[in-house]
Every structure is written in C-alpha cells, then in structure tokens.
Amino acid sequence: MKLFDYAPLSLAWREFLQSEFKKPYFLEIEKRYLEALKSPKTIFPKSSNLFCAFNLTPPYAVKIILLGQDPYHSTYLENEQELPVAMGLSFSVEKNAPIPPSLKNIFKELHANLGVPVPCCGDLSAWAKRGMLLLNAILSVEKNQAASHKYIGWEAFSDQILIRLFETTTPLIVVLLGKVAQKKIALIPKNKHIIITAPHPSPLSRGFLGSGVFTSVQKAYREVYRKDFDFSL
C-alpha cells in the first residue's frame, strides 16, 4: 500500500504537489514513514490525520501560514482510552484534549491583542477552514519522543510546499514563532510576502507574551484582504 492509502490527501493538494511525489526524496519519506507505521512503535498523529492541515486548507485558499515544528508527542485519557493529543495541525490539539502550555499562551496573547475570548478547547480547525495553513515542518512523531521523526525527511517536503506557495502573486502572511521556524525566512522571496516573527509561545521561551504578534497579523490581514481574520473558535 502507498502513503495516500493510509493518509488521505485532497485532490487539490495532489494536483498542486504532483511533481514532488515522484522525486526520490519524497519516495524515501514515504518508505521511512510507512516502515515506522508498520513497526511496533506508536506514531502520531493518526495516519488519517497526517495531512489534516492540507485537507482543511486547500492551496488556493491559503492566506496565512502558521508554521510549527513537529506534532505533540503526548497522549490524554478519554473514556479510559489513551489517545494522541496531536491531530495534524500545528499547535492544535484534539477537541477533548487538555490545552498544552504553548497553546494556552497563544490564546492569552490573542485575547490581550484582539480581545478574542479564551476558548475552552484547543482545536484550531476553524482557523484552518478560514485560510490559515497550520503546517508543521515535521509531520509525524513517535509517542513520547519529541523530534523523533526528523530523520524521515519531512522538512524537505514542507520546504517545497512553502516554496510552491510563495510563488503565488497574492501576498501571504507568514507567521514564524521561534528560532527554528524563523530559519524558513531564507525560503521567502523578498518584498513579496508579509513576514511576522515572535518568540516561541512555549513557557520555556521568553518574550512571546506581550509581543503583539496577533495585532501584527490582523493589521497585515486587513491590508491584504480589507477585512479582519476571524480568530474565534
């Protein structure tokens, strides 16, 4: 079986990225990921959610990109069943999962900047459906092992996705939180897209709270689209 048999990807993205899927680097990603899936190890997110960010935000609908690093590797209990927190969107978690510290800080800053009520749920699917691509640079992870799938090669794929998206004529708003994400600035054509940077929202990082990052995002969105982005959840 092929990757897309385990991890469905929308037709719009298959067409947008069709040339990538034939390249040796992607065939190697596919091989390594499928080997990991078939191993005794538990892989997050569920394979059916691997391409959730793409399936909720078609390439022609992308207006904002919020780049994450790799999926949450933790679990939570629901009805005595252990379930993955990760659900295929950067920073987002399953509807009934506890809200992680980084996402709590995102919600705090969003409330401080724009007055958006702090949600009781950490599922950001609504943002994705409104045109925010919630993309992790690395798309999968082994349970309880942060950055364990760096070896698979996902970053080469996510870089190509960004490069292809940056070819668009409409300015994209690219939100890069933390030093790892900010390395992607090198991929962005100068004077074409709007780059917004801030420290990572992790409590281990300093400077995110009070950065005004969402004020900057909303200002940029108004400049490009003449309306506000709806951050409500």
Swiss-Prot record:
What PROSITE patterns would the database entry show?
Answer: U_DNA_GLYCOSYLASE (PS00130)
Q: Name one GO molecular function term.
A: uracil DNA N-glycosylase activity
Database matches in CDD domains: UDG-F1-like
Key words, A-Z: Cytoplasm, DNA damage, DNA repair, Hydrolase
SMART domains named among the record's database cross-references: UDG, UreE_C
Name the catalysed reactions: Hydrolyzes single-stranded DNA or mismatched double-stranded DNA and polynucleotides, releasing free uracil
Q: What is its EC number?
A: 3.2.2.27
Localized where? Cytoplasm
Give one Pfam family: UDG
- Main localization, broad class: cytoplasm
Instruction: Please provide, in alphabetical order, the Gene Ontology terms of the cellular component aspect for this entry.
Output: cytoplasm
| Swiss-Prot/TrEMBL GO biological process terms | base-excision repair, AP site formation via deaminated base removal
User: What is the documented function of this protein?
Assistant: Excises uracil residues from the DNA which can arise as a result of misincorporation of dUMP residues by DNA polymerase or due to deamination of cytosine.
Q: Could you identify this protein by its name? A: Uracil-DNA glycosylase
